[in-house]
Amino acid sequence: MSAATEANGHHVGQSLRRKEDPRLITGRARYVDDIELPGMLWAAIVRSPEAHAKIVSIDTSAAAEREGVHAVYVGADMADLGGPLPCAWSPEGFNNPEHWPLARDTVKHVGDPVAVVIGDDRYAVVDAAEDVVVEYESLPVVTDPEQAIEGGPLVHEQFGTNKVFEWSLPGGDIEAGFAEADVIVERKFVNHRTAGAPIEPRGVLADYRAGALTVYSSTQVPHFLRLFLALLLGISEERVRVVAPEVGGGFGSKLQVYGEEILLAWCSRKLGQPVKWIETRTENMAVSHHGRDQISQIKIGAKQDGKITAYHVKILGDFGAYNMLLTPVIPVLGAFVMGGCYAIPAVQTDIVGVFTNKNPTDAIRGAGRPEATHMIEITLDQLAAELGIDRLELRRKNFIPRDSFPHATATAVTYDSGDYEKTLDKLLEHLDLEAFEREREELRAKGVYRGIGFSTYTEICGLAPSRITGPKGLGLAAGGWESAMVRVHNTGAVTVYTGTSPHGQGLETAFAQIVADKLGVDPANVEVIHGDTGTGPEGRNTYGSRSLAVGGEAIARSANKIAEKSKQVVAHHLEAAPEDIEVRDGKFSVKGSPDKGMTLAEVAGAVYIYDIPDGMEPGLEETTFYDPENFVFPFGAHACVVDVDAETGKVTVARYVAVDDCGNAINPLLISGQVHGGVVHGIGQALYERIHYDEDGQLVTGTFVDYALPTAAELPSFELDRTTTPSPVNSLGSKGVGEAGTIAASAAVTNAVIDALRPLGVTYMNMPLSPMRVWEAITQAKEGAPA
């Protein structure tokens, strides 16, 4: 048994170290860039320097004559492709332009691909790509979404508008709610554009031979990718295999069917050789999809005692130049939790998506929920100041009561479980607010302004119940189920095949813990296979904090089936009733007689030599396809303490405390790791990170010199705690946690900065809270300008 195992044999709930780490820290892990195949060629992609232009001509002759160059292709060469790149949702009135792996007539943003060069050597094809001469006829550019929607230059002329779609989620009587309000607060939020910036950029290696295609890709969605490779290339799906080897982070930016994946597969089939492309960091920042980029107008009404009566949000989403796999879905996810943790009787979200001449947006960690949480949490602080009510008391007054779960919200979803008072109470146990006020005064005398900000959040994850999101519900062209196959070998070793595709979360460890408890084995003897469509059943991949709540439940159900069959075998051998057999201390034993039992290895031995009850099929292998009945809704309360230098505007995060509730914990160590990473991501957006284009559509922040990511040097040690409110949706009682920190953090940081600067007259700010922006806010406040 593992050292962390309790006496009763339970591994779930223990902080086991990650099974994945030895191969990663010893350099034995294999990423796409580590894979080489005989006869492998390299690809370099020629990209547009123009944000919007007509392609007049492309001269590839000089590049094609380069030594070692095998081929140069342009969009016209791919006329045999079965269709454009996919978007999974097409609501009524949806404008969806064709989006091809290589642009055909016009380019719509800087970085749009126009040609690909294939050759023997990685660096030679990059040089050859510079010999491709493209003549462009520049067209008008629009990068401001408000200008785009108000009559700016058209990105796609065929639609006669830059509007992608309109979508509303009304709940309750919004007009009556505002009529009832004593106080109304209105604000404009700008949730700026960010990048996923994984440590490993994307990479693709395509190998077509003998009528079969294998694609190695740094992707979160190998099963989706296989489907669209088959459809677009006209290859029977069983002849297509997608492998996601080690994936060095994704954060949503690899939740995509990218043009490069289709392009390289097409090139490999055309040339009859493997073709590889590894994204540069510059390409990653320019053409891997971005996130956020919403401008929102909010209006909230409340009674004088603080009870909120109505909340209305109007979102203008900058989708960039094209709709990608889930582009229009992102603000919709936020709409489902727009009311946050609060019992607001009327909530309405109106969404307008708009095209601009920028890289497309799609899911980045949190995907709509950080934007929603940021708005409601900043707004509550603004409302509290307007009412003269303590901001925490305002939250408590409006929390959904703990005894009202499951709770049907005004935003068309039912929260599964929650206890928001409990997480806030535990958070305050970590904070000595009286001491904080003393420290605040001492620091202010030195010219340092200290503030504390709070963020109480809930999120929607465990995507997704197919009845809600699928064709019969929201209309997504995919079910939200997940699959798992559990196989017990002759020796009692266990292999798990999961349809979800981990990429850094530690799920090999968590899944092994679940199976270990179900079958009475050591997690070390449980191997988890993932990210390969050639093994195991069809799956739905990794996104939306779904891997544990949906994928883990599928695994648990398969393991339960094996456990039940094993109990019948043990009962047969021990002459006991199956219902009297339990899994305890590493074996299947008779209740009350722990000395009478069989290990899983002994059970497997009996099954495979066919010493089993009459009528039982041999084998210990079970498959489950699990479709949840509901989403799961993790929640928590975070606090951030910042120090602001009033002379320079520099913000320093002095302390960060987080209390999260993700239901029953499978591995607390993994939870802490996920919260750590998520909080850093949220702090990064609040203070440092920003994707910025100039008015000509040129990317200004295309490197890590310009796009500032936080490092350990900018951050304190985080203080983490948890409460436990099990979910009734799955048998594990668990919820997701991978995005929680990001969802809470930006609001906590922003509220802290505003709290610090309130004595100087600053009452409101939009992110990122850079030194220049903070200094300008202080200066304007001193001059009496409105915040």
Where are these regions (language model features)?
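Conserved catalytic cysteine-centered active-site region
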Residues: 105-106, 236-244, 267-280, 284-285
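Glycine-rich loop/linker segments at domain edges
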Residues: 14, 20-23, 90-92, 162-204, ...
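Helix-loop-helix junctions that connect adjacent transmembrane helices in secondary transporters/permeases
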Residues: 152-233, 401-493, 700-714, 719-721
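Thiamine diphosphate
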Residues: 246, 250-272, 276-278, 507-515
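Flexible, low-hydrophobicity surface segments
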Residues: 1-164, 184-187, 270, 759
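Short acidic, glycine/serine/threonine-rich loops at helix termini
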Residues: 82-87, 128-131, 226-228, 251-257, ...
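C-terminal catalytic domains of large/alpha subunits in multi-subunit enzymes
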Residues: 66, 75-76, 234-239, 269-275, ...
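Extended active-site and interfacial segments that coordinate phosphate-rich ligands
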Residues: 19-23, 130-139, 222, 227, ...
